[in-house]
Each structure stands twice: as C-alpha cells, then as structure tokens.
Amino acid sequence: MASTVDSNFFSSVPALHSNLGLLSPDQIELAKILLENGQSHLFQQWPELGVDDKEKLAFFDQIARLNSSYPGGLAAYIKTAKELLADSKVGKNPYDGFSPSVPSGENLTFGTDNFIEMEKRGVVEARNAAFVLVAGGLGERLGYNGIKVALPRETTTGTCFLQHYIESILALQEASNKIDSDGSERDIPFIIMTSDDTHSRTLDLLELNSYFGMKPTQVHLLKQEKVACLDDNDARLALDPHNKYSIQTKPHGHGDVHSLLYSSGLLHKWLEAGLKWVLFFQDTNGLLFNAIPASLGVSATKQYHVNSLAVPRKAKEAIGGISKLTHVDGRSMVINVEYNQLDPLLRASGFPDGDVNCETGFSPFPGNINQLILELGPYKDELQKTGGAIKEFVNPKYKDSTKTAFKSSTRLECMMQDYPKTLPPTARVGFTVMDIWLAYAPVKNNPEDAAKVPKGNPYHSATSGEMAIYRANSLILQKAGVKVEEPVKQVLNGQEVEVWSRITWKPKWGMIFSDIKKKVSGNCEVSQRSTMAIKGRNVFIKDLSLDGALIVDSIDDAEVKLGGLIKNNGWTMESVDYKDTSVPEEIRIRGFRFNKVEQLEKKLTQPGKFSVED
C-alpha cells in the first residue's frame, strides 16, 4: 500500500494517484522514476482502480524490463535521449573540434611470408579466444523470411552461415589445441546475440542440427531487449497507438552486445579460465573466417587492445572509414567514421578535396567491416567503468524544418564498433587490412536493390556473396599452384558477376594457407565449368585435372588422394527469376540453381588410404 509520502508525490497525477493501491513498492519506485523524468503523460488516460487492473500491471512489467535491461535504467536512457535530441535539433556535429588522420595498423597481402606467419600465430592464439556472433536480424531486407544465419552460405553444399561459423571455430579449436605444448584441450566459447525476432529460431536451428558438432555447453545465447521509443524532443516515451498500457519499442542496435556480455558474467569466467581475446563478427559475411587467423595473429603480435578488421576502401565508398580523431583539447580516439561524415570532416580540417584515393588507388582510411578483436583484460576493465554502455546516437525523422515534431517515434541506437569511443588515448587501437576478395562479401541486399547498384560498386547480395566464395577459393588454390581457369561473366538477377569454378571445402580441410599448400602438389587444373566440394580433412590433390563435378566426403581416418583426369557432364547453372514464387526463397534470391547432371561422388566411411580417379 502506498504511504502518505507517496500519495503527496503522486497527487499531481490524479489518474495514477487513484491506482497506487494496486502497485507493489517496486512498481511505485518505477512510477516515481517515470514522473521525475517527465513521463506523467503515460498515465493520463488511466481509468480508476478496478478497471483494466491486469493491463496496468502488465504496463509496469514492461517498464521493469525496460529499466533493468538498460545500463543505468530508464532515468539514464531518458537523460541521454534529452541531450542527444537537443543536439540533433540544433544540428550539433558530434565531431566538432576533431581532426582526422590515418591511424596505425597492419596491411596484409594474402600469401606473403608476413601473412603466413600471422596466420600461424593466430592459430596458436585461437584457443585463448571467445567468439561472439551478433545475429539479431531477420532476412527480410534480403527477400528471405528466415533468420539470416540459416541462409545457405553457398548452394553447392547448402551449408548455412551458422554451420560454417561453428565448423570454422571447431577447426581453429582443434588446430590450436594440437599446437599447445601442455596437451590440454580447451573448448572455444561461442556466444550468439539474438533478439525477440531470432532467439527461438536460432535455438531451434542449433538443436535440430545437434549444434553442428559443437558441445551445447560451448554455446551461449544472449537475447537483447528493445528500448523505449520517444515521441518528441522532450524525450517523452511513446505509447502504442493501439494500447495505452504499452510503450512502443524498437531495437537498440548491435552495440547492446557489450552490455549483455558485461551483465552475463561471462567475461569474468573467461579471464579466470585464461582466455585473452574476444572476437566479434556479424551474421552474413561468408568470407570472414578467411581473415580471422591472420588478424588474431596481428592482435597478439602488436598487443592491440582493439583491432578492427578492415578492407581497402575507395574514397567516398559507402562504407565507414577507420580514422584517428584528435580534438583541439588534445584527446584522441581511433574509431569508425561513417562515409557520409568522413568527407565533410576532412574538408573542414584542411583537406580541401576531402576523402580522395592516394597513390595505392584507395582511400588512406581503410574500410570498416564490423569485425573486432578485443583484448579481454582491458575490455572487462573498461566495461566495469561504463557498465557496458556504448556511446549512442539518435536519428529522428522530423516533420519539417522547425525540427519540433517527428514523422514517427524515434529511439536511441548504438553500434558495436563504437566501443573505442570511451577508451583513453593510451589504449592500443589499430586495424588489420586484408584483400576484399579474401575477407569481405556481406549478404544484405535483395535482388531488386542489388540490380540498381551502379556498375562497378559491390552488390552485397546473395548472388554476389556466393560468387565471392567461389572466387576466393579459386584464387587461394591458384596461389597454392593449381591452374584454376579464369571466370566468365554472367548476369544473374540483374547483376553482372564473375562466375568462377564452384570450389568449396570444409574448414577442417584448410583453415590457413600453409595447410592448404601442403594438400596440393604436382600439376593440377580445374576448368571453369567444374564443381569441387571437399568435405573431408585428409584429402590431398595431386596431379588432378578436373572438368566436371567432384564431391568427396571422408571420415578423418581416411586419407584420400584426388588425381588423374576426372571428366563428366558436371553441374550446370540455370537462371532463376527472383519473382518466381515456385522456387524456394533461399534459391530465388540468388538468381540461379544447380542442375546436377552428373558427378563423381565418393563417400569414404572406412579408415585407410584411398585414391579417387575417374
């Protein structure tokens, strides 16, 4: 029951005052927080006690959730919102007073001695790492109704993104444990940040597939909550137009991963277990594990607290640039600056041409691909100071130039890669640049949008993402000495792409270049129309001439040699229209499917030595 003090406090809001008898002491405290922060409008339409009581209690359940899931609670959320909305209204630039310069980092070229050494070092470090996948999104923007991690990475084998990620982590785990001198086995923790949209479907995908070979105890799902929407510049919380007892909510952004890790207690547990690194990555870049061993090697060698994986970036390209920003007061930070902010920032800082390509043909500011490697100790220390909170931003859509009313409610947002914004200048923050063909092929645009992309710019579609995998694998084998025939150009779903030989392999076959080189010898060649899928570990390619389709699946104790001339009718590629609803979504968004006319397929389930020749 509410005390006299409470009654006096709430007397200015009669509709709430008359309902105090319904509320628990905790709920009364939450009501106080709301009133102290300018939210009395939430109760204006409340009827007297005895009417809709269940709905009123449900309202406070939601308020309790919103309060507990945000660092500092709703009071902190509303305070930050008021500040950011005031800045937005006057057009304040968050980078005022800052000058950009190129930070220090490591540029790696695939196949060089330095690259190979960094890969080897990265494998050694892998058992000291935890992997965090940020997977809160559905595939609607792609024209796919499932969760994005369930989408096939490529359709030669049909392996989905999540399976590929898990098998890559397991391959690194095994290789790293083998190298470690004390002979101990350590399981690499794998964390998946989900949302209301993806949580149950991600869990179902894992359980239906026995976690793709990972121990269920290795995998932790952390679900992010949404945040309250804001109706106006006073940061008044927005009610659902169809339910006066419910606050409108929207996703807060992938920056939530830091507060979730902080509150989960996992960071402390990992430190106790001797872990040293936390790797963050996003849900649909099918090439990213090509870059992880070497970038982890760079982190260990350079002792970076923060290492952003990056790719060469053309000036003004629509991808954030990693920049060192130095303020007139002397403080500095190394962060991702969005492309539309980088150019004006440079022009305002004495670079009249803004963001331009240097003698390399690329911008000196490398392109951020949202993959971070953080050193665990300093990361945990920093989160203890911030409670896991990340610098936020707000992006209201105003009705007109007075900037007094919004077209629709807005909310605060945060991004995973903004973590370094709160770090002291002494923090060692760097980057690792790798070839785009090796490391970056995100799948985020639907066929219609991808077809509108200006020629020469990346499509970032399911079509280009799959073709990039075949290109990367073909180029890796070329550098290992295989004569892989050059690609042909083809238009699929309105996008002109290079079609290379359809070559895929399981991560355990070759996680790093030096391992792949050991498995290839003699004179090998693969024609452009060929398909080759290697699903075993101990498969060796020697003097192979492939013109057709070859699928090899073998247990670890089977040693398999692929050689001689293997020629058959192979698999053909058939165009599919993305509007053709008779075709499954995951196929039609690519614009093609395989017609498996003929192949040589070997499944070896017994130990021993085998030779596969036509």
Curated annotation (Swiss-Prot):
Changes seen on gene knockout: Plants produce collapsed, nonviable pollen grains. Male sterility.
pH dependence text: Optimum pH is 7.5-8.5. Inactive at or below pH 5.0.
Highest classification ranks of the organism: Eukaryota, Viridiplantae, Streptophyta, Embryophyta, Tracheophyta
Domain of life: Eukaryota
Family, similarity comment: Belongs to the USP family.
Keyword terms: Acetylation, Nucleotidyltransferase, Transferase
Tissue-specificity statement: Ubiquitous, but most abundant in rosette leaves, inflorescences, stems, stamens and pollen.
Name of the molecule in the record: UDP-sugar pyrophosphorylase
GO molecular function: glucuronate-1-phosphate uridylyltransferase activity; UTP-monosaccharide-1-phosphate uridylyltransferase activity; UTP:arabinose-1-phosphate uridylyltransferase activity; UTP:galactose-1-phosphate uridylyltransferase activity; UTP:glucose-1-phosphate uridylyltransferase activity; UTP:xylose-1-phosphate uridylyltransferase activity
Dependence of activity on temperature: Optimum temperature is 45 degrees Celsius.
Modified residues (N-acetylalanine): 2
Function: Required for the synthesis of the intine, the pectocellulosic inner wall of developing pollen. May function as the terminal enzyme of the myo-inositol oxidation (MIO) pathway. May also play a role in the salvage pathway for synthesis of nucleotide sugars. Can use a wide range of substrates including glucose-1-phosphate, galactose-1-phosphate, xylose-1-phosphate, arabinose-1-phosphate and glucuronate-1-phosphate.
Catalytic activity of the protein: a monosaccharide 1-phosphate + UTP + H(+) = a UDP-monosaccharide + diphosphate
GO BP of this protein: nucleotide-sugar biosynthetic process; pollen development; UDP-alpha-D-glucose metabolic process; UDP-D-galactose metabolic process; UDP-glucuronate metabolic process; UDP-L-arabinose metabolic process
A Pfam family this chain is assigned to: UDPGP
GO cellular component: cytosol; pollen tube
Record keyword Transferase present: yes
